[in-house]
Amino acid sequence: MATVVIKIGGSTLEALEEGFYEGVVKRASLGDKIMIVHGGGPAINNLLQAMAVESQFVNGLRKTTAEVLTAAETALSGQINKQLVRSLYQAGGKAIGLSGSDGHLLKTIPIDTDKLGFVGAVESVNVDVLFNVAKAGYIPVIAPIGMDANYQPYNINADTAAAAVAKASKAEELVFVTDVDGVQKDGKVIKEMDEVLAKHYIEEGVIYGGMVPKVNACLDSLSGALTKARIVNGKKAYHPSAGTAIVKQSNVLTSGA
């Protein structure tokens, strides 16, 4: 029985097929502890547009004013979180939607208030909340809105939140759900590669464009008990060996598809 953290990006949500949710539910039914962390950038953008509020990005992070924070919390903890919960139920599973503020799940500290406003980094994770939810037979679905020691909410990058949850829960695997089949070389999906090979492929340009930050997020997550990160296509049925696995140990001799 493994603990698996699945990160679903906001831009991927609308493309997820029913088969993906069914695969997640099946894996949970076989005994794995599944924890989901999600983003919601497009939903936040739509809400900000409706509110006539402009936002900007600094080094890839959304600068979060008080107005932007309200939109982010509404879209993430409300709309997107509950959409995912409903989809898991429709696939035959059981899920509970949580914000990082619930149970002080994601204790947060500001990154740089002057430059980023209410954007936070995860200081600690209350894993007891997650394990209690999982023990009761539910899949926790986490919106990345954290809270500091003074109960101020913060917007957290979903990749960062997922990595923090994976590390704190001592997960064996972290899965990044995207809209592609995995990392490709010569038109074929690479089934598995280690850290050294992944960095080499980035340097050589085999891994390029939008895949680079995804692979870097996988590399950054490989710490502690986490020995494997995986990139999968959310448009297809999810199963444990799908996509590309990036592993900690240098045991991969080839990049064979």
Curated annotation (Swiss-Prot):
Substrate binds at residues 40-41, 62, 155. Keywords: Amino-acid biosynthesis, Arginine biosynthesis, ATP-binding, Cytoplasm, Kinase, Nucleotide-binding, Transferase. Its EC number is 2.7.2.8. Transmembrane segments: none annotated. It holds the Pfam family AA_kinase. The record marks 7, 214 as: Transition state stabilizer. GO terms for cellular component: cytoplasm. Gene3D superfamilies: Acetylglutamate kinase-like. It is an enzyme of class 2 (transferase). GO terms for molecular function: acetylglutamate kinase activity; ATP binding. Its main location: cytoplasm. This is Acetylglutamate kinase. It comes from Shouchella clausii (strain KSM-K16) (Alkalihalobacillus clausii). The gene is argB.
